[in-house]
Structures are given as C-alpha cells and as structure tokens.
C-alpha cells in the first residue's frame, strides 16, 4: 500500500501499490491488500469553453496530476502471452509518455497543418497499431506535444486509410512492428506521396519500472479546451470512413462517465477488450485516470477469444470487464458454464456496440452476472453511466449519466410502444440529437432507456460493424430500370439487397435485368467499406411481378415490413452464399497438407501479406488475420475436411470447433491437429464403459429426496413432449391429442438465438404443417390440444421465466422425452447437450408444487443393448444393463445408455416424486395408415441405392419392424398404464419376419430382382458405381452400413417385450408388416420423387 510516497509489492491496483505483476503472484495476492489507499480525485471541467483556475481541462494535465498525486496507484496491467505481466503505475505511465514524446519530436516532422481549413491546428499523425498499452502511450505522447493522433482501425482497407489521411492532412504514419509486414507495399506508396512513415517502438522502449515522474518535465498546458486533439473515425453517409474530430473537452467528458459507491469498486481491476481505435475504447484508461480504476489489457500478440479471456480473469481476479457482445456470447457458451462462473463474481460486465442477444443476456443475468449496458455515439462519446449495479437494474436498458444536460422528447408510438428522442448537451449549449429511437424502463423513467432503431437505418453486421447502405440504395434507385432498393444483412456477415424493377419482370428477363444492375452495385460498393460490400449477384433479391415493397404513409420504404415479406428469400440468399463458398473449396490434400492449407488461406482469406513473406510456422495473427477472418477460415476448413475422403466418417464440425484456429494459430499447428484428428482410433470397450459411468454421474440429479407424492392419474393429463417435429414425436403428439383423457400437450421447441419465450405456458399454437407433412389428420378440437413452448434445453429452468416454469410444474402430469439426434458418427462426449437437456427435464419433473408424481418416459434405443445381443443368444430382458457389458464405443448407442443410467439414478433417489421408465425402441418404419416414411432413414436409403444399382442386396436373418403410428400408440399407453412403471421396457414388434421375404416384397414394387449378391459385395458395388450420393445415398453412410447395419437390423439382437406387452394393448396385438403396407411405403417414396416410378 502507498504511505507517504513509499510502496510495497502487489498488483491488485486497489491498494495503490507499485509492484509488477508476476503472473498469479501478486495479482491474486489478497494478503498484500491490507487497506485501500484513496485515489485523489482530480477536479476536471469539461463544461467550460474557457480555462478556469484550479481545474483540469485536458488529458495531458490529467496525466501530470496523477503522476504527482496518485503516483503509486496502478494505471494498467498489460497481459502477455507468458507471465509475468507488466503493471504500470501512474508515475511510470507519465515517464513512458514523456519518453515517447521525445522520440516523436526527434523522428517525426512535427508541423502545423498546411491547409487553413484543416480540422486541426497541427498536422495529425496516424497510428496503425495493436490495441494495447503501446497505442495508449503513443496517443497520449502525441497529445502531450499538441499533435492530434489519427487512430486507425486495423480492419480499414487501404482505400479507406488513404481517404482518412487525405481528409485529415496527416503528416506521418506510424505502424507497429507486428502490423508493418502486411503493409509493406502500402507504406512505400504513402512515402511516395510525402507521408513520413515509421515503424513504431514497442511500449517496452518507453516503460521503465520504478521511474520517477519528477525526472521529467510537466506537459505544456493547452490554452484552448476547444482545440481538436484526437481524430477517430466512423462510416459516414459517403460510404467511406469520415474523421471524427475530438476536442480536449470532449475527451474529458468521455473519461468521466462513472459513479462508484466505494473505493473498492472504483479501484478494482477492470479488464477491457474494447478496441482503442473506437471512442468507447478510451473509457477504460479514462476510468483509471479519473476514478483510479486500473485497466487490464489482454495480450496483443493474438486476438482475444473466450477461453483466453476467461483464463485471464481467473489469473488476475479482475473485478469488472468491458467487452463486445460477440466475445461475451462466446464466453457464455463455453463448456461447463466456465465462462459464466468466471464472470459471476464481478462488480459489472459492461458491453455495447452490436446488440447482445436476449438469450445470452438473460442467461447471464439469471446466472448472477451483473450486466451493464453501454451506450453512446462516436460524436458525443459515452452517454451511459459506468457503475456497479446494486438495485434491480435491468441490463436491457442503459442508464444515462447525470453530469450533463439532456432532454427527452416523446415521439409517435410505434408497434404499440412509446418512443423517445434524446438530445444531449455534453459540452456547451449546443445540443446533439441522437438518431436512435428509444424506449424506456418505466421503473426508472428519467434515466433508463434502450435503443430500438435508427433514423438512418444503419445495418449492424454480425461482427458489430455498422454498414450504411445509403450509397448502394441511392445508386440503384437513381438507375432508370430500378423502382426501389433496400439493403439487408442485420446480424449477418454480408449485406444483400432487395431490388424492385421499374417494370415487371418475367422469368425470361430476370437474368438480363440482374446483369444490367450488377455493374451499378459493384460501382457503389467500390465507394463503401470492404465489410459493407455485396459479395456476389447471389445476394440480390428481385421483387417478382405483382409484389409491392411496403411503404409508410410518407412514402418511405418500411424496412421491417419489407424484411418480413421477403424473409424466405433473404434466408435463401445466405444459404446460397454459404453453398457457393463451400463449392469453391476443394478437398484437403493430405499428402501436401501444409502447402495446401497455405494456398487455401491465401486464396480465400485474401491475406494482404504476399505468400513469399510468411511461412507455415508463422502465427496467422502476426500476418494480419482478424476475428472475422478466423470465422471464415474455420468454415473453409470444415468444408474442405468434409470433402476429404479420410474424414468422410468424421463430424468435421466437432473436429474443428470454433476455437480451433485460436488453439492452432499457424499452418503447421493446423496441419498437425487435422492429421491427429483423422487417425481417430477405436475406443476400447473398457474406456467406453468408464466414459458412460463418468457422464452418467456428471449429469444425474444431485441429492436424495425422501418426499413421497401420490400416484398420478391419467385423467385430465397435461403432457410435456419433446421431439414433436420428428417422426415418432409427431405421431405421439397426434395420438395424445386424439385421446379423451388428455387435456393438453405442450411440445417443447428449441428457442432460436436471441428470441424470447412466451410468458405463459402453451402460449404458441402448434404448427399444423408438421403433422400434415406426414399425412397426419386431426380435427380442429384435437389440434386445439396441441401447443408449443420455446425453451433453452440446457439453460437453468429451461430458460423460462419463473412464472412460466412454475405454472408448467404445477400443470404437467406426464413427460415424454423423444428428442434425440439420429447420427451414428458423433462421439459420445458430443451428446452432452442431450444429457443436460434430460437432467433439466428430470429436475423440472422432480420439483414443484404438484401433489402427485410425474410420470416420465424416456425414448431409448435397441442400440444400448446391441453388444449384449450380439454376444449372447436369446432375447434381452427388460431390465437395466451394466455399462461394462453394454457400452460399445458408438456415440449414439452409448449416449442413450448414459441417459438410461441417469433415469435409473433418478428413480432411485427421487422415486417419491417421479415414476420413470426408459423405452428401448427397435426398428420403426413409416406410418401404416399413410405410408409416409422419412427418406433419410436407413431402409429408404438402401432401396434408392438398389434402384440406382439395379439390384437388391442379399440379407439373411430376421427383421422386427413396427410402424411408427403403432409405436406412438404404444408410447402413449405405456405413459398412461396403471400402477408404477417398470424401469425399462421394450418397444419392438414381437412378430418377426425374414429379410428375404421383405426384400422380395419391395423388389416386386420397385421392379428389382431378388437379391443374390451378399451384402458386403453389394456395398462395394455401390461404392464403385458412377453416381453421387443423391443417386446412391448409402454412400453417405458407408461406414455405418459396413460396420453396423447387419448386426443392428438383421435380427441378431432380439428384445423381449413381455413387460411392455402387458402395458400396451397395441403392442400386444401387433401383426407382421404386410404387402399392403410395403406398397404404401413404395408409393409414398415414388410420389415424392425419391424413388423412380
């Protein structure tokens, strides 16, 4: 702690110490923090245009003040790729800025602006550097000598940089060593134009631990607070970035947007990932200078990602964070909620820029994270307050700061909501009207608002960048052949545009029209930011004849209504763009992988650095790859790997996760990780069993309950159903709706990202198309029993608001869990989403105020006992099995086994509240009533491949097929059976048939000869056949058909149904699948075009 100028080691920052970070030694060393030395608050004044006695009017003065009055308080901590980190005090920061200023004056042509109409008195110096303490030192060094820095975003194109340099009259250009490599050509071009170009020094050249600020002179005091001293930039109405001049007064306004209740809140470490080239990026160092809140900067030798940020939080015990929604989203979605756990202890987690999805925000808030909404504009600076929320503050709203004047005007209501306009007077009498329309929190009507739309309709892309489509829309509308144009792309990676022709088009004239407007689009895009450009003609939606773009009463295009009208076409655009990108990517060349990867990256990521300037061991981040390009690269790698023969049986999305490039940042590391991922290797049965046990223990309900509830009744049943869009689930929904004893069926639907669930259970009607597409007919009264409820399957309390969750618990009497992904290639650990879903459903069912037990039916699979059936002759009993006997190393089968174990544990520990059963299902076919059978299942795929080959395979053994509508009735009857349910039951047709007879029956319907070629040889013929996997769909699952199909489908595994037949009259009365049903299946596939007639 600081006492009379003396200091001790430590890095917390809250204690005013000077120690330098030794990784975890010091940053978390709370023993060293015995008391918090108050931070001497400076007397700043941004309201006055004239200098006042005793007041600070500029940031350089603030640096001097803190170097004398808060010398040993921590200014910032700069993290590095390896510890120890650098802790810089206010005294040391002052010395570093002074030394940097001396280097600037010695090496740069410091001169006044040559144009009388220039924005600044002195010619600016452009800074193109990483967002770390080095950039801060250079910024403040330039300001200290009266030279405005022009801070450039690393994402700017060369055209945009040139435009800003010309608009500001910049005399010099400083680039960091790391970012200089990709700009070699551009730097030479700038030098040729007379711009003095320099490679800047790293901050270590100026930072001197323990330096005495008294050893350097005070900075010269600026005489006019209205002088422009900083140039930021944004995208303006011209489409190119425009310079934003910022005065001394504006900067002081920006750094004073805080109100902390205690010194502990004010002085705790604040992690900032906000880019320093953005106006909000200066808030973090500003908090350090005005409130004593030290900033923690992530290491600058890579792009911050969710995992690295969480690791940094845990190492440093940072107590607050300022970040962007994109990164916060990734942090929230880290496995095992490690991101939320890292954030929950913080005083606040502030975010702004692009919108934070409601789903992510609600999830964080429910997890106890204190979210803070930032708001401001580039022109005004921050308008929201930075504080530690302690009241019932709602994160969806920002809280206005109260140290400046503003007025709120009410606008006309829109969409049933009151709307408001904010005008602020941040520094002087001149007001600035904000273009955003606002809504307000009626609990805090004077201070808490949320932005809901802009008058200028800027489109915020998925990256948080704001694209202004005015140039594009104007250029197109000015063309005589175009009546109207409106861009789209909110939360996407590219813009698209809807074009309404002046004259109606016919199918014959669409192509020519598209060709005629494309040069206009490309010319407009040449004047726009790179991220705002239309990527290809595929991103153009043409308004068909007879359709009119919606307009307001004033005649302007109604964007929201237009987007809704063309929602299907807009979605189609992005699907087509993804497909086009995928089509352009070739399979990986594993024999020459490193060079192949480099070529892929150079071609598709448009790396500025020439290929000759970087190698396979260089970090991609060192050659200028940014976070958006990381996303693009991951998509390219997944696509290329998916097309590669060696990976055909691999889930490439899982093999190459979102953090893959961050974890493997060089070509060599990517190649090694891919090669390692391809050898896979079989999982030993012992390891498979251990993994099943481990996952079952992890996801089982915790604790034991002795509470005993009364048995449930089947009358007036209120059923919660999952998987209602699938084959079995949709038939279960219909079967339940037809039953007189069922009052309601609520089908859980996975909530889309960023949407809100209805506040009351059963709030949304069931989509009738789901059932009608399967030929299922219900009366209006029966449809009325069906409803949907949007949930987040893995979120606490299913992501529902407490009222909805509680009411559902009170009403639901039965739960039928049928949702499950049909994929035999996914590894077991990739089913953890499903395990979390089951646990959440069991938690829901085992708790709540209902007086009776809930009956819970889990749909399992014959695959869980396939290993036992193959090893031992005879039927398998309806009883639990040991993982050591049944785990087989196949993710799908072992995943269902994990769930069975979770169900058994729930029955053991919560038997008083739950009556549970796992129903192992055998092979289900299509409906015997309608003939509808999903063409993406194994049997239809086999038959279509047989048509393509001209012959059926020879299959021996027996089959046990049950039509899906009979299976659905069986599930319902099990759920409503009398007495306690058996812990395990089997759902398989007890009547067995020969494969030979079944293939003969299908052969007659398809005109194919009986199978004479053994199945293995037949598969080889399919693999060698000249045709794609649309003609021969078995090719899509070659691994499954070769390895598992015969053992699973040909009667080697027999399920005993003695118990379940006692529970279900439908199952007890089952007959064989006859020729009429086979004909119905074949006729259905022919009617859809799947099979040839």
Swiss-Prot record:
It comes from the Eukaryota. It catalyses: ilicicolinate B + AH2 + ATP = ilicicolin B + A + AMP + diphosphate. The keyword Oxidoreductase applies. It is an enzyme of class 2 (transferase). Residues 1-27 are annotated as: Disordered. Induction: Expression is induced on AF medium. Residues 591-678 form the Carrier domain. Its EC number is 2.3.1.-. Pathway: Secondary metabolite biosynthesis; terpenoid biosynthesis. InterPro entries: ACP-like_sf, Adenylate-forming_Reductase, AMP-binding_CS, AMP-dep_synth/lig_dom, ANL_N_sf, Far_NAD-bd, NAD(P)-bd_dom_sf, PP-bd_ACP. One of its GO terms (biological process) is terpenoid biosynthetic process. The modification O-(pantetheine 4'-phosphoryl)serine is found at residue 627. It holds the Pfam family AMP-binding. SUPFAM superfamilies: Acetyl-CoA synthetase-like, ACP-like, NAD(P)-binding Rossmann-fold domains. Residues 35-392 are annotated as: Adenylation (A) domain. GO terms for molecular function: oxidoreductase activity; transferase activity. Residues 1-26 have a biased composition (Low complexity). Residues 721-971 are annotated as: Thioester reductase (TR) domain. Keywords: Multifunctional enzyme, NADP, Oxidoreductase, Phosphopantetheine, Phosphoprotein, Transferase. Belongs to the NRP synthetase family. Contains three distinct domains: an adenylation (A) domain that activates the substrate amino acid which is subsequently covalently linked as a thioester (aminoacyl-S-PCP) to the 4'-phosphopantetheine prosthetic group of the second domain, the peptidyl carrier protein (PCP) domain, as well as a thioester reductase (TR) release domain. Non-canonical non-ribosomal peptide synthetase; part of the asc-1 gene cluster that mediates the biosynthesis of both ascochlorin and ascofuranone, a strong inhibitor of cyanide-insensitive alternative oxidases and a promising drug candidate against African trypanosomiasis. The first step in the pathway is performed by the non-reducing polyketide synthase ascC that produces orsellinic acid by condensing acetyl-CoA with 3 malonyl-CoA units. Orsellinic acid is then prenylated by the prenyltransferase ascA to yield ilicicolinic acid B. This is Non-canonical non-ribosomal peptide synthetase ascB.
